[in-house]
């Protein structure tokens, strides 16, 4: 039995734990990491979570039991050296504007991010993304990637949750809010619906429908999105007096967040003289993006890159530990048809690796040597000693630096002098100076909704709902399970009113349609507004709050 002191890759917190693994070696020796024969011990000395784990963290042995990716060229198993050589040679056959590089920083360490960015620089392409470039036009790095020790959440006198459900999205954050409440903090939830999980914790719930009802209603007919509603809510809250001043605002920043939503959250913080902490679903989102800032590499919006892939402008794609079919990219296999060359470097087989021309197997996080910077700004160790991912990237780029050289450069860029999870923090202000201010949140002219509607329009409206997807760690990973058994169907919460309108009975299914696609889902009844459906599963890939058509499944 071998023990690994590691961190969970489920979200941006990086909760500490021990993984116990059978000493028996599988196919490929120690590289054949598997969840079989693996168990978890709680690491009570962890600075982040004091040993507590959420549902995702408790099921990491299942997460690591996924099938390993084979190192192959054209579907044929080859040595790592052959695959690296072929990838390097093929990359040189494309013009730099035809090549794109994507890495969602979930299991990518700082050292790997630096090697990845060095490869991008060597190729000379501006087509790269770490997932968050779209938000750089909204505010400076110091706001977007500012960390805050979770102890400050516990010490806050006022906590405002801005369309964030910590009980679903970041359960270990919910524990900190509960402690703040026990210490006398006033906790306010700004949301679309009352949170049944938080009874007795929230002092006040401010419903969007109650203060900006017109915007919410217009989402059913005019195409408003979460950003529009959030902007209207922020304006209304700012005009509500001093009760929210000097709060700690908690909001989520992820690939699907509208830029207007982020602007609204920052505007609210500035106008109420409050602090703001953006939670993030990817473990090393702060570290990787601050590293790119320190290297003066800003990249492009991931969705712009994917559009260029679909249009055929980008012909070559390199994916580092990223599955676009699950990581929020909102693409399917048909979007990759115009690609001429696809390289996937990952630890596990994924849906998108099936399309790859070259696949290169790397190590799972718990075996890696390296560091990450979590949402607190805290520097954490991945816990292992494997250096292969860095070495592979260095060989593809031709730089061939040693791991130690790469680590020293990454630490220098981030201002890391030592690795101590209790004391080591990264300060964004020392990396990227703030030149941008949150965009002004302005009133949006309303078109109005006609009082009279045709029978066909009325029928359509009766089946039009807003789907609010609460993005738990399971949402962002190509793996989903209940406590003990896997399930394939998503579950949505619906109002009693919608159940009556659709004449639904227990055991029946819903069909949800959006953008020409449909999906069958299970349902459960909840006390939520009649216009709303809520899911903690991934039902659609193109938004957090989206308009859908719903009917009883045939």
Spans of model-derived segments:
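N-terminal export/assembly segments and adjacent metallocofactor-ligating motifs
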Residues: 1-227, 499-501, 505, 520-524, ...
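A cross-kingdom feature strongest in bacterial/archaeal respiratory oxidoreductases
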Residues: 3-7, 29-32, 157-161, 169-196, ...
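Glycine-rich phosphate/diphosphate-binding loops that line cofactor/substrate pockets in enzymes
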Residues: 83-100, 149-157, 233-248, 272, ...
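Short alpha-helices
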Residues: 192-193, 199-229, 253, 261, ...
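Internal, active-site/partner-interface "lid" segment
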Residues: 227-232, 400-416
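A glycine-rich, hydrophobic/aromatic-adjacent loop/helix-cap motif
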Residues: 247-311
């Amino acid at each position: 039995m071998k023990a690994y002191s590691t961190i969970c890759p489920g979200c941006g917190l990086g909760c500490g734990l021990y993984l116990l693994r059978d000493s028996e070696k599988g196919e490929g020796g120690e590289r054949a990491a598997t969840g079989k024969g693996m168990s978890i011990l709680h690491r009570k000395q962890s600075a982040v979570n004091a040993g507590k784990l959420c549902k995702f963290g408790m099921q990491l042995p299942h997460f690591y039991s996924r099938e390993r990716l084979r190192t192959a060229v054209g579907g044929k198993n080859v040595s790592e050296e052959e695959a690296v050589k072929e990838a390097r040679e093929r990359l040189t056959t494309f013009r730099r504007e035809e090549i794109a590089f994507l890495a969602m920083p979930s299991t990518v360490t700082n050292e790997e991010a630096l090697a990845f960015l060095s490869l991008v620089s060597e190729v000379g392409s501006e087509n790269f993304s770490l997932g968050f470039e779209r938000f750089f036009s909204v505010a400076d790095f110091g706001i977007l990637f500012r960390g805050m020790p979770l102890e400050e959440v516990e010490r806050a006198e006022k906590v405002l949750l801005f369309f964030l459900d910590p009980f679903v999205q970041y359960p270990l954050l919910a524990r900190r809010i509960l402690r703040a409440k026990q210490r006398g903090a006033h906790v306010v939830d700004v949301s679309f619906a009352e949170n049944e999980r938080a009874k007795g914790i929230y002092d006040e719930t401010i419903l969007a429908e109650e203060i900006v009802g017109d915007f919410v209603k217009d989402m059913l007919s005019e195409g408003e999105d979460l950003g529009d509603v959030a902007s209207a809510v922020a304006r209304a809250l700012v005009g509500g007096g001093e009760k929210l001043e000097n709060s700690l605002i908690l909001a989520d920043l992820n690939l699907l967040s509208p830029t207007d939503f982020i602007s609204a959250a920052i505007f609210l913080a500035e106008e109420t003289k409050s602090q703001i902490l953006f939670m993030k679903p990817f473990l090393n989102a702060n570290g990787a993006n601050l590293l790119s800032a320190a290297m003066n590499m800003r990249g492009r919006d991931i969705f712009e890159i994917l559009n260029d892939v679909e249009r055929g402008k980008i012909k070559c794609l390199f994916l580092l530990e990223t599955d676009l079919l699950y990581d929020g990219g909102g693409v399917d296999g048909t979007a990759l048809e115009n690609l001429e060359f696809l390289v996937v470097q990952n630890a596990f087989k994924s849906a998108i690796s099936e399309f790859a021309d070259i696949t290169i197997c790397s190590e799972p996080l718990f075996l890696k040597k390296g560091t990450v910077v979590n949402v607190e700004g805290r520097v954490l160790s991945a816990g292992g000693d494997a250096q292969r991912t860095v070495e592979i990237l260095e060989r593809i780029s031709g730089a061939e630096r040693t791991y130690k050289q790469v680590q020293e450069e990454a630490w220098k860029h981030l201002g890391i002098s030592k690795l101590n999870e209790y004391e080591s923090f990264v300060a964004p202000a020392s990396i990227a100076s703030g030149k941008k201010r949150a965009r002004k949140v302005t009133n949006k002219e309303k078109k109005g909704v006609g009082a009279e509607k045709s029978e066909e329009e009325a029928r359509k409206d009766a089946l039009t709902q807003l789907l609010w997807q609460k993005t738990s760690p399971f949402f962002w990973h190509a793996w989903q399970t209940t406590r003990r058994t896997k399930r394939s169907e998503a579950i949505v919460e619906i109002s009693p009113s919608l159940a009556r309108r659709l004449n639904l009975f227990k055991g029946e299914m819903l069909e949800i349609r959006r953008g020409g696609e449909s999906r069958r889902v299970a349902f459960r009844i909840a006390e939520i507004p009649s216009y709303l459906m809520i899911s903690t599963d991934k039902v659609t890939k193109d938004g957090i709050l989206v308009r859908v058509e719903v009917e009883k499944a045939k």
